[in-house]
Amino acid sequence: MFGKVEEKLNNVLKTEGALYFILIDPDEKNCLEIAEKVKDYADAIILGGSIGITNLDETTKQIKEIIGDIPIILFPGNVDGLTPYADAVFFMSFMNSNNTYWTTTAPTLGAITVKKYNLEPISMAYLGIEPIKRTAVGFVGEVNEIPQRKPEIAGMYCLSAKYFGMRWAYLEAGSGAELPVSNEIIGISKKLSGINIIVGGGIRTPETAYQKVLSGADAIVTGTLIEDNPDAVKEMRNAIKKAGIDKL
């Protein structure tokens, strides 16, 4: 049984072949400005960060007023990254963290708040891919990063996630990563698991996004892109949607 947000995302996948998620850090001073710029291009807004969260309730309400019916999915960096004003939450395990806090304890502590806030949980495996160790999420999450040259390891993690009952896997190279997740990792992860594959980190050009979708990605995440080139979001969406149709 899917919730409303996940059902909506799956319906877009069936008709358009790929999703475009835009990550907004609620602690960024210009987060409302970013929301205004991207509202016409995102299939969902992913809201969260890997360091501190301040004034999340008010920021989420303000972003919701700007983006209208576009779902806000929380991407919590810790148990304080939850708010009742979002539509859903990626209920995730950082599967290749060396610290059990991130694999099981944090989601366990957050579960009762997810229920209290009536947030739709979207079960997801979160996997740190090389070079994530050199990014904030890799440092905070104490990640045992998956080497780019060993795509079968990522594939096995995704298959494990499927057997645990997770429906999504996020292959993350880290915000601002110098290299994105390889096409080989994406391809084998999708082929082995069959679950929805999200790819983020280091995707800076429409051409790169196009190749990631053709390789098997179901959703592409960009975040810092809008800060570097505000006009790139439309081009990115067009490339993702073209690849999605070409893949169908």
Swiss-Prot record:
Its EC number is 2.5.1.41. Sn-glycerol 1-phosphate binds at Y170, L171, E172, A173, G174, S175, G176, G201, G202, G223, T224. Pathway: Membrane lipid metabolism; glycerophospholipid metabolism. It is an enzyme of class 2 (transferase). It catalyses: sn-glycerol 1-phosphate + (2E,6E,10E)-geranylgeranyl diphosphate = sn-3-O-(geranylgeranyl)glycerol 1-phosphate + diphosphate. It holds the Pfam family PcrB. Mg(2+) binds at D25, S50. One of its GO terms (biological process) is glycerophospholipid biosynthetic process. Its cofactor is Mg(2+). It is found in: Cytoplasm. GO terms for cellular component: cytoplasm. Keywords: Cytoplasm, Lipid biosynthesis, Lipid metabolism, Magnesium, Metal-binding, Phospholipid biosynthesis, Phospholipid metabolism, Transferase. One of its GO terms (molecular function) is magnesium ion binding. InterPro entries: GGGP/HepGP_synthase_sf, GGGP_HepGP_synthase, GGGP_synth, IGPS_HisA/HisF. It comes from the Archaea. NCBIfam families: GGGP, GGGP-family, PRK04169.1-2, PRK04169.1-5. Prenyltransferase that catalyzes the transfer of the geranylgeranyl moiety of geranylgeranyl diphosphate (GGPP) to the C3 hydroxyl of sn-glycerol-1-phosphate (G1P). This reaction is the first ether-bond-formation step in the biosynthesis of archaeal membrane lipids. PANTHER family: GERANYLGERANYLGLYCERYL PHOSPHATE SYNTHASE, IMIDAZOLE GLYCEROL PHOSPHATE SYNTHASE SUBUNIT HISF/H IGP SYNTHASE SUBUNIT HISF/H. Belongs to the GGGP/HepGP synthase family. Group II subfamily. This is Geranylgeranylglyceryl phosphate synthase.
